[in-house]
Amino acid sequence: MSIRKILQFPDYRLRLLSKPIKIINKKTKKIIYDMFDTMYANNGIGLAAPQINILKQIIVISSLKPTMSELVLINPVILKKNKKYINTIEGCLSIPKKTAKIKRSSCIKIQAINTYGKSFTLTAKSLLSICIQHEIDHLIGKLFIDYIN
């Protein structure tokens, strides 16, 4: 597969809205493979398609712990957010060398589609919850620095 160029802030394309995926075909799967290659080549734990200048609602997340598989989230939607928040230090492949303390929901429930076109729900806690929220923000043109007061 291919390693793609990651858009860097303040590139205006990072602020654009992504469109839902209608059909999962070979082209979609190639984008997903390229996203994983790009994420790992840049030592990331998550990547959203807009970061590689593809305005589609696709997110990939690495296996954050040995018992977890890699995740592909197509057209993800947050169904529920826990009212308990956690503050963590976040960074972003599109904003290198910058981190900030960000407040995120500690637990979320999402709905998404997998690479086989099947809808599923997932409850995510801790780091996975934070990572998913961060990547979903990319799909709506929002960056972690937007949360800094």
Swiss-Prot record:
<keyword id="KW-0408">Iron</keyword>
<dbReference type="GO" id="GO:0006412">
    <property type="term" value="P:translation"/>
</dbReference>
<comment type="function">
    <text>Removes the formyl group from the N-terminal Met of newly synthesized proteins. Requires at least a dipeptide for an efficient rate of reaction. N-terminal L-methionine is a prerequisite for activity but the enzyme has broad specificity at other positions.</text>
</comment>
<keyword id="KW-0378">Hydrolase</keyword>
<keyword id="KW-0479">Metal-binding</keyword>
<dbReference type="InterPro" id="IPR023635">
    <property type="entry name" value="Peptide_deformylase"/>
</dbReference>
<feature type="active site">
    <location>
        <position position="135"/>
    </location>
</feature>
<dbReference type="GO" id="GO:0046872">
    <property type="term" value="F:metal ion binding"/>
</dbReference>
<feature type="binding site">
    <location>
        <position position="138"/>
    </location>
    <ligand>
        <name>Fe cation</name>
    </ligand>
</feature>
<dbReference type="GO" id="GO:0042586">
    <property type="term" value="F:peptide deformylase activity"/>
</dbReference>
<dbReference type="InterPro" id="IPR036821">
    <property type="entry name" value="Peptide_deformylase_sf"/>
</dbReference>
<keyword id="KW-0648">Protein biosynthesis</keyword>
<dbReference type="GO" id="GO:0043686">
    <property type="term" value="P:co-translational protein modification"/>
</dbReference>
<comment type="similarity">
    <text>Belongs to the polypeptide deformylase family.</text>
</comment>
<dbReference type="Pfam" id="PF01327">
    <property type="entry name" value="Pep_deformylase"/>
</dbReference>
<protein>
    <recommendedName>
        <fullName>Peptide deformylase</fullName>
        <ecNumber>3.5.1.88</ecNumber>
    </recommendedName>
</protein>
<feature type="binding site">
    <location>
        <position position="134"/>
    </location>
    <ligand>
        <name>Fe cation</name>
    </ligand>
</feature>
<feature type="binding site">
    <location>
        <position position="92"/>
    </location>
    <ligand>
        <name>Fe cation</name>
    </ligand>
</feature>
